[in-house]
């Protein structure tokens, strides 16, 4: 069974956060050419059945990307509806002298192809918008209004120092990035790209909550003692 044996699975629950369940796991490890591919996966939801589906979906996405170590291979082009041949560097993690280490992937796993197209596209745009956030000055800081404040309260995050940013450079989709601090210590971040602005806000906050619980609250975050980096907070 997927969740049996020596695989590590953690579940968190708190009645103070609107019955939100958080699940994380380390189900396998893939090492190719000395590189360890992302091995952990996590999910957050009020419905336990959906919680496990989300977790397995992320696990499956990362596992398939890790196994696709070929130099080139056959694929099915959804836009052209035809078979094609594609080089490895276009569908995964890689290295080039021009860009260094890079990630070209927007991935999705599920049963509905139409939904998967949108999800994968949003993830790819989210990654590129995140690059613009970190390395340019095109992001806009969002004022935390009552709508956002209520979501933070539901997640028990309203006492934290929260910064939220908006990117919309690569199309009509909305990308939200959230940074979370407490007493000057960086705790967590979350991001989401969506056709809906409100959905992007909600999912970015949920991701930040998930990451904080999985890494910081369990004492596993490696940079928990780093003080706040004022450059990317004060100058965007």
Model-derived segments and spans:
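Helix-biased "structured C-terminal domain" signature
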Residues: 1-236
């Amino acid at each position: 069974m997927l969740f049996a044996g020596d695989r590590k699975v953690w579940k968190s629950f708190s009645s103070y956060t609107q019955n939100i369940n958080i699940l994380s796991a380390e189900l396998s490890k893939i090492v190719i050419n000395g590189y360890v591919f992302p091995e952990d996966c996590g999910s957050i939801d009020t419905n336990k059945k959906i919680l496990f589906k989300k977790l397995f979906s992320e696990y499956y996405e990362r596992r398939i990307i890790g196994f696709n170590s070929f130099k080139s291979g056959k694929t099915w082009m959804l836009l052209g509806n035809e078979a094609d041949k594609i080089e490895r560097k276009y569908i995964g993690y890689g290295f080039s002298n021009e860009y260094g280490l890079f990630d070209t992937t927007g991935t999705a796993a599920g049963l509905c192809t139409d939904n998967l197209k949108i999800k994968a596209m949003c993830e790819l745009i989210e990654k590129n918008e995140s690059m613009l956030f970190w390395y340019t000055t095109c992001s806009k800081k969002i004022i935390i209004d009552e709508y956002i404040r209520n979501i933070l309260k539901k997640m028990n995050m309203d006492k934290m120092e929260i910064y939220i940013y908006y990117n919309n450079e690569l199309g009509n989709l909305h990308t939200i990035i959230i940074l979370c601090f407490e007493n000057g210590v960086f705790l967590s971040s979350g991001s989401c790209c969506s056709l809906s602005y409100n959905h992007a806000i909600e999912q970015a906050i949920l991701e930040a909550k998930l990451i904080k619980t999985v890494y910081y609250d369990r004492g596993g975050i490696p940079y928990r003692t780093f003080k706040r980096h004022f450059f990317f907070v004060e100058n965007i």
